[in-house]
Structure formats: C-alpha cells, structure tokens
Design a protein with these regions (language model features):
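Beta-hairpin "wing" of winged helix-turn-helix
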Residues: 51-66
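Basic amphipathic alpha-helical segments that dock to polyanions
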Residues: 44-48
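Conserved small/polar residues in nucleotide/adenosyl-binding loops
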Residues: 133-139
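Amphipathic alpha-helical dimerization/coiled-coil segments
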Residues: 79-132
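N-terminal helix-turn-helix DNA-binding core of bacterial DNA-binding proteins
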Residues: 2-35
C-alpha cells in the first residue's frame, strides 16, 4: 500500500502559511517542505479550490492562508486533496472464477479499505491546523 504524499505536503504548507502570517511563493514553500515548486502548486490548487488559500500574482504574490487555522480540520485538508489513506492497487483473486473466496476477495478487501479510510477521516475531524502548529514548534531554552 502506498499513501499519496499530497496530504503531508498540504498540511506542511498550511502550517507554514499560518506561521508566516503573509503570502509565500511556491518556491519559498517548496524550500521549507523539501520538494519542488511544481508539486507545491499542484497540491495547493486543491486547497485553493476548497477556499483554504488564495493566490496573488506580482512582487508580493504567492499563497496566503484564508481559512482559520483554529477551525480548519485535517479532515477538510484530506478531502481537499482527495486523500485516501489506505488503498491497494493490486487485488488478489479473480472475480470470474467459480470459487467464492477467489471471486469475492477483492470486494472484501475494498470494503475493508473503505472502512479504514472512513475511520482515518473521522479521527482527523478532531485535529486542527492550529493544534499541529503548537506541536510542530520546538521548545527552545
């Protein structure tokens, strides 16, 4: 199973934008996230469509957080970037076989993965971007 990194990138970008309090370019975000600006733009397009960020062109342009980090849940972020936490591209068995186990296993596993994704997104409903900002800030002496 492979989990798409879009959710991780989106959360990281939202924390950066919230912490900075100003617009940041895709290049500045990419530098902090340790990825490339094209990937940042691709993922943040989903956040923009969901109304979490806005973009502005020009000298002071870039991405700016428009959502309230105190109420923006990780579930909302996951939904904005179409995250599936549990997925499997390969299925065992063969739907065309006479064996009920062999022909039914893909459906059984898909239902299991669907339930696991529902549990993950329900859990994320209770975690906000602001709560992660407090966790991500290191304690300094």
């Amino acid at each position: 199973m492979i989990v798409d990194s879009s959710f991780n990138l989106a959360v990281h970008a939202l924390i950066c934008l919230s912490h900075s309090g100003r617009s940041l370019s895709s290049e500045a975000l990419a530098e902090n996230i340790c990825t490339n600006p094209t990937r940042v733009r691709r993922v943040l397009a989903g956040l923009k469509k969901a109304g979490m960020v806005e973009t502005r062109e020009g000298l002071d342009g870039g991405y700016r957080l428009t959502a309230d980090p105190a109420t923006l849940s990780l579930r909302q972020v996951a939904e904005a970037v179409n995250t599936r936490f549990v997925d499997c591209a390969w299925h065992s068995g063969d739907i065309d076989r006479d064996c009920s186990i062999c022909s039914g296993m893909a459906g059984v596993m898909d239902a299991l993965y669907r339930s696991m994704n529902e549990e993950c997104t329900a859990y994320l409903s209770h975690i906000t971007i602001l709560s992660l900002i407090h966790i991500s800030e290191p304690t300094r002496p």
